[in-house]
């Protein structure tokens, strides 16, 4: 008799959650995703200042608009030589991490109305998508070669001391079976004016709500370096030829706001998931 009463109470609690909590939850998830998507998709340029307070290795300005870098005007000292890194006026650099981030948010918004009838599946799907997004925003490009670490107005990251993080985030899509491996590529040298010399390679990534600039000095056969300079290549291909690496980081206020919103949404999903799992396990135990 007591078991039947307990089961009845648990069923009523589950019904109350579905009636009073879930509608507001779905609405807040949809609104939060739309707000984050609008922020990250804005075409208004975000100007990022790269400075090196302890050294003068890297200094200048980078502008991001939506998922593209649209302006680069940076000076970099590599060895004894100072290079001017200036993106051509008509050129853009695609930030694949931000493009993937936008795609995931579009996918989440697409799934929400189609999965709401199946609470357990919808919550699980949202957990996976949001986990992938948060991993994507915190992914760190692995570094195995010698580099010079450059701080900026955002805290610099010691990549060699982050191996445990890299192992979890070098593939930020691993929690979704259909997702590809994140690949970091170089920028074609001819997109700059003047073009970068063939012994230099430049790449951008996103980490900890910052835009990260990675500059590589290369050594090797001229034909290999010329091939790298003409193409956008996977950073992994450069590693045998890297003699120096310089990293600079500048925190992006829009990425910071998006990260905060998505982290809050992730917490909401986890809280609702925990409540339903608790009710389900209690209901099972009462039978």
From Swiss-Prot:
It is found in: Cytoplasm; Nucleus. Disulfide bonds: none annotated. One of its GO terms (cellular component) is nucleus. Disruption phenotype: Leads to mild sensitivity to a range of drugs including doxorubicin, cycloheximide, and bleomycine, as well as to calcium. It holds the Pfam family Rogdi_lz. Keywords: Cytoplasm, Nucleus. One of its GO terms (biological process) is vacuolar proton-transporting V-type ATPase complex assembly. Component of the RAVE complex which is required for stable assembly of the vacuolar ATPase complex V-ATPase. Component of the RAVE complex composed of rav1, rav2 and skp1. This is Regulator of V-ATPase in vacuolar membrane protein 2. The gene is rav2.
């Amino acid at each position: 008799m007591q078991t039947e009463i307990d089961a009845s109470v648990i069923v009523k609690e589950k019904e109350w959650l579905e009636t009073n909590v879930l509608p507001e939850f779905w609405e807040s998830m949809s609104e939060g995703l739309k707000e984050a998507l609008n922020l990250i998709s804005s075409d208004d340029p975000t100007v990022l200042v790269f400075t090196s307070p302890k050294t003068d290795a890297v200094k200048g300005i980078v502008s991001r608009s939506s998922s593209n870098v649209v302006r680069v005007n940076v000076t970099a000292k590599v060895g004894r030589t100072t290079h001017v890194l200036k993106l051509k006026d008509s050129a853009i650099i695609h930030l694949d991490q931000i493009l993937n981030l936008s795609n995931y948010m579009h996918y989440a918004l697409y799934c929400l109305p189609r999965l709401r009838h199946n609470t357990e599946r919808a919550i699980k799907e949202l957990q996976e998508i949001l986990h992938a997004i948060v991993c994507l925003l915190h992914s760190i490009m692995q570094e195995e070669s010698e580099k010079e670490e450059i701080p900026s107005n955002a805290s610099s990251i010691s990549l060699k001391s982050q191996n445990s993080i890299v192992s979890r985030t070098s593939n930020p899509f691993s929690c979704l079976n259909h997702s590809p491996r994140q690949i970091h590529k170089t920028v074609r040298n001819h997109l700059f004016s003047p073009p970068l010399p063939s012994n230099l390679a430049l790449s951008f990534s996103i980490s900890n709500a910052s835009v990260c600039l990675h500059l590589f000095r290369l050594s090797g056969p001229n034909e290999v370096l010329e091939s790298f300079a003409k193409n956008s290549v996977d950073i992994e291909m450069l590693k045998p030829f890297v003699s120096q690496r310089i990293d600079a980081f500048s925190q992006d206020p829009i990425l910071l706001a998006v990260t905060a919103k998505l982290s809050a949404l992730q917490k909401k999903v986890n809280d609702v998931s925990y409540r339903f799992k608790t009710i389900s396990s209690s209901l099972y135990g009462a039978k």
